[in-house]
Amino acid sequence: MSTTFQLDTSTSRANPTPAPMKRLTIPAIRQRKKDGVTAQPVVMLTAYTARQAQLLDAHCDLLLVGDSLGQVIYGLPSSVPVTLDMMAAHGAAVVRGSYHAAVVVDMPFGSYEASPQQAFESASRLLKETGCAAVKLEGGEAMAETVAFLTNRGIPVMGHVGLTPQAVNVLGGYNARGRSEAEAAKIVGDARSLADAGAFAIVIEGVVEPIAIAITQAVACPTIGIGASAQCDGQVLVTEDMLGMFERVPRFVKIYEDLAGTISGAAARYADEVRARTFPGIEQTYQPK
């Protein structure tokens, strides 16, 4: 195949990337929230490839190389089987394809839970091999020691509370969290613990809205909602979800484009032309001079 990736700074429908800007830093993201208020919400989307990163970069503050790539890219049933090798490869691609957004790479299941030292070894590998700005890990109070261990050693960490997909087997499914008083209190406590440990931002996923608002008001770092509340300090979605690539998406997803229909339609037209021998035409073939 002849297609190659090349960073294109021209502005067009196919390459909507403007002239290069200075890459955002983690301190700049953290400073978005001052005195408990975020003047400009943080925009984050997932990215898994260099080309996808190029298209999203100018519009985002953060690009998340999520372990959701297990389902989205590899067709796995959950994010649990995702490996550190997979995250490193995709993380490096996203960093190569971006120049503005700070890139955050998920730490996959089994790469950080055993001990803070294991987490440091995994996180330092991701930073070295990808050039990313930070890592993200799931878990609440139990992970606070690990978050502090990493941040004290120069590795910025984004936390993740509420519905944590890596714990889907324990949670029993992808249901909204925080409906009971006890569960709500635990989620708020988890977020406080991560913030106190030095997390530069916290993803709040799949919780009832009052809990997301309470966390946002309680912690000094930015909160980034996904199925949480518009009152969070920022928002994140899986890019393929909001582009309509899947028939079934969580209820918190807004579909901005029917890209699945566009791709399927283009493939159908191509197939029709190949079978009718109308492609390639004169414009797509080389003729003698």
Curated annotation (Swiss-Prot):
The keyword Transferase applies. The active site is at E205. Its EC number is 2.1.2.11. It is an enzyme of class 2 (transferase). InterPro entries: Pantoate_hydroxy_MeTrfase (IPR003700), Pyrv/PenolPyrv_kinase-like_dom (IPR015813), Pyrv_kinase-like_dom_sf (IPR040442). It is found in: Cytoplasm. CDD domains: KPHMT-like. It catalyses: 3-methyl-2-oxobutanoate + (6R)-5,10-methylene-5,6,7,8-tetrahydrofolate + H2O = 2-dehydropantoate + (6S)-5,6,7,8-tetrahydrofolate. Its cofactor is Mg(2+). Binds 1 Mg(2+) ion per subunit. Residues 1-15 have a biased composition (Polar residues). Pathway: Cofactor biosynthesis; (R)-pantothenate biosynthesis; (R)-pantoate from 3-methyl-2-oxobutanoate: step 1/2. Gene3D superfamilies: Phosphoenolpyruvate-binding domains. GO terms for cellular component: cytoplasm. Homodecamer; pentamer of dimers. Catalyzes the reversible reaction in which hydroxymethyl group from 5,10-methylenetetrahydrofolate is transferred onto alpha-ketoisovalerate to form ketopantoate. Belongs to the PanB family. This is 3-methyl-2-oxobutanoate hydroxymethyltransferase. It comes from Novosphingobium aromaticivorans (strain ATCC 700278 / DSM 12444 / CCUG 56034 / CIP 105152 / NBRC 16084 / F199).
